[in-house]
Amino acid sequence: MKTIQELVPLIHQWAKEREIYEQLIPFDELLKTHEEVVELIKACYDDDKPAIQDAIGDVMVTMINYCYMERIDVLEQINDVLNFEGKRSDSKVMLSLSIQDSLTRLMHANFRLLGIGGETPFLCFYEIITIIGYLDDIAFLENTTLEECLNIAYNEIKNRKGKIINGKFIKD
């Protein structure tokens, strides 16, 4: 199993090879994140551990891509979460819904930046850390880790081919 520190550059390379960073904008990646979060909510509601692990990994892949597009050090964000020792929630469904709330705020902040440019506001950093933290909490409740979930997602996509159509990567 690869570490998160090993997986992040591999995911960057995967996305570069598929021209995701060249052909999409950060908001496109947040829309993809939204799709993956909806799958996570459903998996948590169904209490489907394999689907939860897959969805956590998929959300992480899209967040890694978003952070790369916004020039945010995603490893720093992940390390901040993994080093936090606060109280964890005990409801996967509530945590997954909270991810959706944080993602909506991140999308709103990002949408305001479209056409404006400039520095990424603090709110974006806060919401990224919050989303990763909730993902880590759900993984913990499933007796797994972000690292294991990200490995599952990377192993699923690493050989995937496709193309960008209308602002979305479509797998072959």
Model-identified regions with their sequence ranges:
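Flexible "arm" and connector segments at domain edges
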Residues: 1-56, 60-172
